């Protein structure tokens, strides 16, 4: 709708300006602007001496505010951050909002909820995050109530390079509908680059709620003051200077593990033990050169990166902005549509899912253009189908109390051969081969409330962290040493060889000597004829370990999810079953209760 001068208080120039501006605004921006103008109007009336009551007496009565419950299931903190942001924006729009982790929400309260927003990630092979497990199980069980009076919407987070993309969100969405719920707005599935789709989802939610008469069209006036403040974040990373970059493994090791120390001086960034650091890496320039050569593209050609119109030379864009080392089914589908390649279309034909899965595994963009190209498309067309470079999350290996203005990382270099070529981890090999002291890395802190030391410093802790999984426990120990925590601490560490792969060995020995660490058990799998892993050491001490659990100890696991964390989980169940004289079902309930009490926490990948 065009604003006309004849039916408005604006002159011709003002009307033209507004007609150019309004179509470019999103729904949430319009809502914010409405609240801002309302606040300005009230302020002007008060400054002129007009009582606020007189102003409100002439205004129409605001719509009755309705309650909205926002539940999140989050493993690394992304879903939690989006849920909290949604809560703030809803409050500014006049809603009464409760934001909660699914693990803290009492399922028997669900029947009382009128408007429900679900923000949830998918973990591992299509599984819910740890703090969503109990709610997911309840909702899919026999005790789930009928929800005919519920209105809901789901924001699903995932990674399209995995087979079960956004599976948990899809399951919540389907189940809530089966129980009688009606959608406020359609489910939105987000890939790694989730900012824009998440914002569009929230716009749809606000529109749906407001159309139902649930909230005011304007946010609270306080929103008007929330401008001009900027902090370093995932969308505005801080360039941290590299202070140290050392190889932790000894000569002759099969592994290369980097200890990287970064300066946070001047950033204002803070973190707690258990948090992660997001790092935006760059692609290997050699791989980019091969890709440019294969496609016969001009490296200096200017390409547009985003809807905002930011531009870069093609080579720079491929190095720093786009993901080129991972193939996904959506990427293949877009490439087939863009290029019209018959062979690629044949690969993607219905019923050919297993072949697609096999092709994607271990291949990158260079493989795609070599196998099915070169494509007769422009560089701009091709980069438009690529995902933005995702950040890599690393468990922080330091305590801010012990290392002011610094953050330390423990990064395992990834190298392997596949499909006739050497493959390299994007971020890990940047750190191993190209990153020097004095260089900078774009970083941000990812807070993780699902992996935190006990509030009571006297609570015993049991830590299981083989390989680079040791990182957060170095942070835990530094923090406990700084604060003088007196609770018992037991560490299980494992790797290949004692001589070359005992990461931070001297530090662990000093903590043992000083009493900061009570016990440490290690497993070096290649030093014995029969491979020994951390779960074997746990079984050897099953009676004492169960005693610690009975005393209220908190258990922390960090590292590989697919094998190690799965095996350790089953070992814990075995120990509880054996030492507690329980059935398997009782042991599972015991561990689930620990998880509910935040005494069983995992940082797995």
Curated annotation (Swiss-Prot):
Metabolic or biological pathway: Sulfur metabolism; hydrogen sulfide biosynthesis; hydrogen sulfide from sulfite (NADPH route): step 1/1
Organism annotation: Bacillus subtilis (strain 168)
Domain FAD-binding FR-type: 235-454
Name of the gene encoding the protein in the UniProt record: cysJ
Record's protein name: Sulfite reductase [NADPH] flavoprotein alpha-component
Induction summary: Up-regulated by sulfate and the transcriptional regulator CysL.
Residues bound to FAD: 392-395
EC assignment: 1.8.1.2
UniProt catalytic activity: hydrogen sulfide + 3 NADP(+) + 3 H2O = sulfite + 3 NADPH + 4 H(+)
Result of knocking out the encoding gene: Cells lacking the cysIJ genes are unable to use sulfate, sulfite or butanesulfonate as sole sulfur source, grow poorly with sulfide, but can still grow with thiosulfate, cysteine or methionine.
Residues annotated as binding FMN: 74-78, 121-126, 154-185
């Amino acid at each position: 709708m065009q604003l006309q001068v004849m039916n408005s208080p604006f002159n011709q120039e003002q009307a033209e300006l507004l007609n150019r501006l309004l179509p470019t605004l999103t729904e949430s921006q319009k809502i914010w602007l409405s609240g801002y103008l309302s606040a300005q109007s009230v302020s002007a009336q008060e400054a002129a001496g007009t009582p606020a009551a007189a102003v409100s007496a002439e205004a129409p009565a605001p719509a009755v505010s309705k309650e909205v419950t926002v539940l999140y299931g989050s493993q690394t903190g992304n879903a939690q951050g989006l849920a909290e942001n949604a809560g703030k924006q809803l409050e500014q729009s006049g809603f009464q909002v409760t934001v909660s982790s699914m693990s803290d929400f009492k399922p028997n309260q669900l029947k009382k909820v009128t408007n429900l927003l679900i923000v949830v990630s998918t973990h591992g092979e299509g599984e819910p995050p740890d703090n969503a497990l109990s709610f997911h199980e309840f909702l899919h069980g026999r005790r789930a109530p009928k929800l005919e009076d519920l209105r809901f919407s789901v924001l699903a987070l995932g990674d399209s390079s995995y087979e079960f993309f956004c599976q948990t969100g899809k399951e919540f969405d389907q189940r809530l509908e089966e129980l009688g719920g009606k959608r406020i707005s359609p489910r939105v599935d987000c890939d790694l680059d989730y900012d824009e789709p998440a914002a569009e989802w929230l716009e749809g939610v606000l529109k749906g709620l407001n159309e139902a008469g649930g909230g005011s069209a304007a946010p609270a006036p306080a929103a008007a003051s929330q401008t001009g403040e900027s902090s370093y974040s995932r969308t505005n990373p801080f360039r941290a200077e590299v202070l140290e970059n050392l190889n932790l493994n000894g000569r002759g090791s099969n592994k290369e593990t980097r200890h990287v120390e970064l300066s946070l001086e001047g950033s204002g960034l803070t973190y707690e033990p258990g948090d992660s650091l997001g790092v935006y890496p760059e692609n290997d320039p050699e791989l980019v050169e091969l890709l440019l050569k294969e496609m016969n593209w001009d490296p200096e050609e200017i390409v547009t990166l985003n809807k905002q119109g930011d531009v870069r030379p093609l080579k720079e864009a491929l190095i720093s902005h786009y993901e080129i080392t991972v193939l996904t089914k959506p990427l293949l589908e877009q490439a087939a549509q863009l290029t019209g390649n018959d062979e690629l279309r044949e690969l993607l034909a219905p019923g050919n899912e297993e072949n697609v899965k096999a092709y994607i595994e271990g291949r990158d963009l260079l493989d795609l253009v070599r196998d099915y190209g070169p494509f007769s498309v422009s560089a701009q067309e091709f980069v438009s189908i690529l995902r933005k470079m995702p950040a890599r999350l690393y468990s922080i290996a330091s305590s801010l109390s012990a290392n002011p203005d610094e953050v330390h990382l423990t990064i395992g270099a990834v190298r392997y051969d596949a499909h006739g070529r050497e493959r390299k981890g994007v971020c890990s090999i940047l750190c191993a081969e190209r990153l020097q002291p004095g260089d900078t890395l774009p970083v941000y802190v990812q807070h993780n409330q699902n992996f935190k030391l006990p509030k009571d410093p006297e609570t015993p802790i049991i830590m299981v962290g083989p390989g680079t999984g040791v990182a957060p426990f170095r942070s835990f120990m530094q923090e406990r040493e700084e604060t003088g925590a007196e609770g018992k601490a037991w560490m299980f560490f494992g790797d290949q060889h004692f001589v070359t792969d005992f990461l931070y060995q001297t530090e662990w020995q000093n903590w043992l000597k000083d009493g900061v660490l009570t016990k440490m058990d290690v497993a070096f799998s290649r030093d014995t004829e029969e491979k020994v892993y951390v779960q074997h050491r746990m079984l050897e001490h099953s009676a004492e370990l169960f005693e610690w659990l009975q005393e209220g100890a908190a258990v922390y696991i960090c590292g590989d999810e697919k094998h190690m964390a799965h095996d350790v989980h089953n070992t814990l169940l075995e120990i509880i079953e054996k030492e507690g004289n329980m059935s398997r079902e009782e042991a599972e309930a015991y561990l689930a209760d620990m998880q509910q009490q935040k005494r069983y926490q995992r940082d797995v990948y």
